[in-house]
């Protein structure tokens, strides 16, 4: 130390500045190199995952060649997988992620690293329980979703049309891989119940019933007519439509028929309609679903306790509202009549109504389309189709004007699908230019939980459009609470069936306590939840996580809490598992 004592202060100051400059430069270079190395890893991971099948690639990227990705031969892939290989690969990814100097990563990359670590750790935990995976199902199964995904396959170039036609020829080998998987499940005592089988077969038979008037032909012709890159002549359109119809007759319909026949041959080899709890490893698999789909890692007992508390809270609020106004239900019935806006007008109103609670978007262009008449019975009242990540357009909301919902319910649905729901959340997240892997590795609990959370705001906004907003406010609040209670009840039943081992009788007793006695209604609720484990919790447990996170932030910040800024932070972080979201909200 004495050596430096005699150095003039000015020189010492210059030396220190010089030393700091060098060290900062070295550190900066190291920071950059570590972030660059991490980004190279995520880009490589994205390219690997996005090319798994043609549908994933096409729906994710409009121009894969601009990212150095060569389109592989058009294929739907296979339903078969090697659990040991998958586990090993996930563990390798986890090991590589842990090799990065975490403290030297930017906050954005640390967040991505946390999300990926949890994602691959969770996937690796599945192991042999992957045998309980079920690709088929009456509502959400592959055989139900595939025609819709094919029908909505965007034609941007002539190559897209060529790929689409090739995909039709791969439906049969893809379904054959599912048949092989189902035979393996049958041999292991894991095949579906005859009740579920009947529901799937009914759908397959419906699809093949009128081969000469299949709705996919109509939609293909409609898309060809609209294609302009460059446009086809009438003669070329006719030739392509003829070829398409031939593929439907010789490839797609036979594939569905073969699937139906093969499944029928396995009738009786499955157990009666029961939840996952009745299968070996079923409870562990259900926990895996909660983690991988819902993004929650809290004990099941804690989830049940929170659900029960919310159910009681909603019930008490409903009772209080009815006590204040015994004619509230009559007022609610009037509300739907007063909300006379068209879907287009509803979507135009929502961005303006939500300004006080949610950040305004820079650009929120979208298209509103009507579901093709032949697809109405298969689809929900409305749904949002996400755009490719490299174009971010078009943002498309489909309206199914089948008349199955009231105007108030439709308004809530459009808030869920549009503003401030899925469309708004997707566009908000994209404005931050996240890494591509964030679009592939996501969290359904965040995505559906957010849309359900903001749906409650949608109901509130609807009240402001009524003839008498003040009296409508409580009536519309009643409607939301009723919806919340239904979702909560179904979520508790989901846990009861798949984790606690409830059978149909036990489920009926539970529903009876809430005044649901109709035998066919009870049977339908039970069967749907048996076939879709964890599905309701993606929506409702996700919703409660956002609700609770808001309460935590309100308590911590007190008068400094700003609802719009709270929402902005959630949107900036984007879809991640809830432990990761909570970490970065602090």
Segments from the language model and where they lie:
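N-terminal Lys/Arg-rich, disordered targeting/topogenic segments
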Residues: 1-7
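N-terminal maturation segment of proteins
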Residues: 7-586
């Amino acid at each position: 130390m004495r050596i430096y004592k005699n150095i003039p202060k000015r020189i010492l100051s210059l030396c220190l500045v010089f030393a700091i400059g060098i060290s900062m430069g070295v550190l900066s270079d190291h920071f950059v190199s570590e972030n660059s190395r991490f980004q190279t890893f995520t880009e490589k991971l994205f390219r690997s995952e996005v090319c798994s099948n043609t549908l994933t690639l096409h729906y994710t990227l409009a121009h894969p060649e601009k990212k150095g990705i060569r389109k592989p031969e058009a294929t739907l892939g296979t339903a078969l997988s090697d659990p040991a290989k998958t586990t090993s690969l996930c563990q390798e990814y986890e090991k590589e992620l842990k090799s990065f100097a975490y403290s030297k990563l930017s906050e954005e990359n640390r967040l991505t690293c946390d999300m990926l670590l949890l994602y691959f750790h969770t996937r690796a935990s599945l192991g042999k329980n992957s045998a309980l995976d079920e690709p088929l199902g009456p509502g959400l199964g592959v055989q139900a979703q595939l025609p819709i995904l094919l029908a909505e396959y965007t034609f941007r170039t002539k190559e897209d049309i060529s790929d689409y036609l090739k995909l039709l020829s791969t439906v049969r080998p893809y379904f054959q891989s599912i048949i092989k998987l189902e035979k393996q499940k049958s041999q292991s005592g894991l095949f579906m119940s005859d009740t579920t089988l009947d529901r799937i077969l009914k759908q397959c038979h419906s699809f093949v019933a009128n081969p000469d008037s299949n709705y996919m032909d109509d939609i293909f012709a409609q898309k060809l007519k609209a294609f302009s890159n460059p446009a086809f002549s009438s003669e070329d359109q006719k030739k392509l439509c003829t070829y398409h119809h031939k593929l439907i007759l010789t490839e797609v319909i036979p594939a569905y028929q073969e699937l139906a026949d093969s499944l029928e041959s396995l009738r009786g080899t499955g157990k009666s309609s029961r939840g996952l709890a009745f299968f070996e490893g079923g409870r562990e698999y259900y926990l895996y679903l909660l983690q991988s789909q819902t993004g929650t890692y809290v004990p099941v007992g804690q989830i049940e306790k929170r659900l029960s508390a919310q159910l009681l809270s909603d019930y008490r609020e409903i009772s209080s509202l009815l006590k204040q106004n015994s004619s509230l239900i009559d007022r609610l019935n009037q509300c739907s009549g007063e909300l006379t806006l068209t879907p287009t007008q509803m979507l135009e109103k929502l961005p303006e109504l939500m300004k006080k609670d949610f950040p305004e978007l820079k650009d929120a262009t979208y298209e509103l389309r009507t579901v093709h008449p032949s697809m109405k019975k298969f689809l929900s009242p409305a749904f949002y189709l996400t755009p490719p990540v490299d174009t971010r357009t078009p943002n498309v909301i489909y309206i199914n004007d089948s008349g199955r919902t009231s105007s108030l319910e439709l308004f809530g649905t459009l808030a869920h699908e549009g503003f401030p729901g899925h469309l708004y959340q997707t566009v908000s997240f994209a404005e931050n230019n996240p890494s591509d892997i964030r679009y592939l590795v996501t969290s359904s609990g965040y995505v559906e939980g957010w849309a359900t959370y903001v749906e409650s705001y949608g109901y509130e906004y609807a009240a402001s459009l009524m003839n008498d907003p003040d009296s409508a406010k409580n009536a519309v609040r009643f409607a939301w609470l009723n919806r919340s209670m239904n979702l909560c009840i179904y979520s508790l039943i989901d846990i009861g069936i798949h984790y606690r081992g409830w059978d149909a009788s036990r489920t009926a007793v539970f529903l009876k306590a809430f005044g649901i006695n109709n035998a066919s209604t009870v049977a339908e609720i039970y069967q749907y939840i048996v076939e879709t484990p964890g599905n309701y919790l993606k929506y409702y447990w996700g919703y409660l996580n956002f609700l609770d996170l808001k309460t935590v932030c309100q308590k911590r910040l007190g008068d400094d809490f700003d609802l719009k800024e709270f929402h902005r932070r959630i949107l900036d972080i984007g879809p991640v598992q809830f432990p990761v979201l909570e970490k970065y909200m602090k």
